[in-house]
Amino acid sequence: MTLNLCVLTPNRIVWDSEVKEIILPTNSGQIGVLPNHAPIATAVDIGILRIRLNGQWLTMALMGGFAKIGSNEIIVLVNDAEKGSDIDPQEAQQTLEIAEANLKKAEGKRQTIEANLALRRARTRVEAINAV
């Protein structure tokens, strides 16, 4: 039995096909979803979506949003998403270093919050490349 997974951003469909299992980053922790999962709606955190397909695990960097799970269908609406295989490792590492430097230079509460979010997004992209 499989699940139909659809990952959408405001600009495109990132994923729309059947999968065996997913591990979804939510604001209250990661949740595993198998076929016949109980219906839920949940906030999606910045983090790694893990997708099991044909005995392999694939990764996707998610940048926060919402997910609806029900009747073997998962719809994930996020601000942005990238498949781990589509992320350029050098560019992601460079972005991470810039985000770390910007956090050190941040002055005031607003800049610190924005720099922390940018750092979380950059770390997630790097982790999506290296995750299994």
From Swiss-Prot:
Keywords: ATP synthesis, CF(1), Chloroplast, Hydrogen ion transport, Ion transport, Membrane, Plastid, Thylakoid, Transport. It is found in: Plastid, Chloroplast thylakoid membrane. Signal peptide: none annotated. It is a peripheral membrane protein. GO terms for cellular component: chloroplast thylakoid membrane; proton-transporting ATP synthase complex. InterPro entries: ATP_synth_F1_dsu/esu, ATP_synth_F1_dsu/esu_N, ATP_synth_F1_esu_C, ATPsynth_dsu/esu_N. One of its GO terms (molecular function) is proton-transporting ATP synthase activity, rotational mechanism. NCBIfam families: ATP_synt_epsi. F-type ATPases have 2 components, CF(1) - the catalytic core - and CF(0) - the membrane proton channel. CF(1) has five subunits: alpha(3), beta(3), gamma(1), delta(1), epsilon(1). CF(0) has three main subunits: a, b and c. Belongs to the ATPase epsilon chain family. Produces ATP from ADP in the presence of a proton gradient across the membrane. This is ATP synthase epsilon chain, chloroplastic. It comes from Coffea arabica (Arabian coffee). The lineage of its organism: Eukaryota, Viridiplantae, Streptophyta, Embryophyta, Tracheophyta.
